[in-house]
Amino acid sequence: MDFKKLAAQYKSELLDNVLPFWLEKSQDLEYGGYFSCLDRDGSVFDTDKFIWLQGREVWMFAMLYNKVEKKQEWLDCAIQGAEFLKKHAHDGNYDFYFSVTRDGKPIIQPYNIFSNTFACMAFAQLAEATGSEEYKEIALKTFQRILDRRDDPKGRWEKSYPGTRPMKGFALPMIICNMALEVEHILEDKSMLDHTIDECLSEILNVFYHPEYGVMLENVSPDGTPIDCFEGREINPGHDLEALWFMMNLGIRRNDKALIDKCVEIALSVIDFGWDKEYGGIFYFQDIKKAPMQKLEWDQKLWWVHLESAICMIKGYQLTGNEQCLEWFKKLHDYMWTHFKDEEYPEWYGYLNRRGEVLLTLKGGKWKGCFHVPRGLYQIWQILETL
């Protein structure tokens, strides 16, 4: 495998294909912020603004400005999105709405804590790019709200009946693992950060990870006991593999080889569990008992699942030299470039059916924005350059 040639392929796809698409097609220069709902050619098909995706796009361009090149157009793109978030995206208490209209009127209440996590990452990254104390303060206030809400993330918008079947989700500790490293540079109290990381790692490895299955469960009872219901049996292989490369980064930060080795061991188990042996690609959802799924999209092949898994595998290989990781990376690389890449228009498809045929031609929507494709290309490019 020619790592240098591959690195150039990922770099070129990011800088020459994907980023120009979002810069040109997504910016709303009239009202601020970004259009997320972009058809195959980049034409806008819906003007609502989803705060997860607004925050992610600010983060993306600020991160690239900080890490790749001091390009003014990247910084300008991030700043105009952040100004929209600052003015329109939260309730004054730094709880961020799920969605707003094109001109910034709230549509969906701030029930979803992930709007906060991506806003926090955005303002923290932009504070680093600009030196702005205001952006730093917004990031810190938002981070505090995430910690305040962590045990009851939906608060008054929680629809499950209290006490009958208490359950907690894997997504939050997984995102906080990543966010911890994102906000490290703006936190005064590093011990609080270490405590937060300890809690998240412990929760993932001791509560959500079940060695008898070799995977993380997506929802468990508060003490980690599996629950035999639709939600309790659910596995999201892409989530697991994304979390595992976040945790490898924490292993690097802590110089913890045992943690990195454990992550690689679990990752190889998860990808084997999640891989479609008949058609190739990774299933979106699976049931731990192989029972029928409640989610009709369970067998679809999604862009982010494969990109995050590819990052996990090439990072596992980089850190441990495990040849199985490299074999899986090759498999994922071939699958992604032959199925998700659009040969005619920029950016990548997001949604394929089980057989790997394009299900939706959109390049951005309610859940797909300027995030997993560019972040994945960037991460893989950077890792390949070290090999």
What are these model-predicted stretches?
Residues M1-L387:
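Glycan-recognition and catalytic cores of secretory/periplasmic carbohydrate-active enzymes
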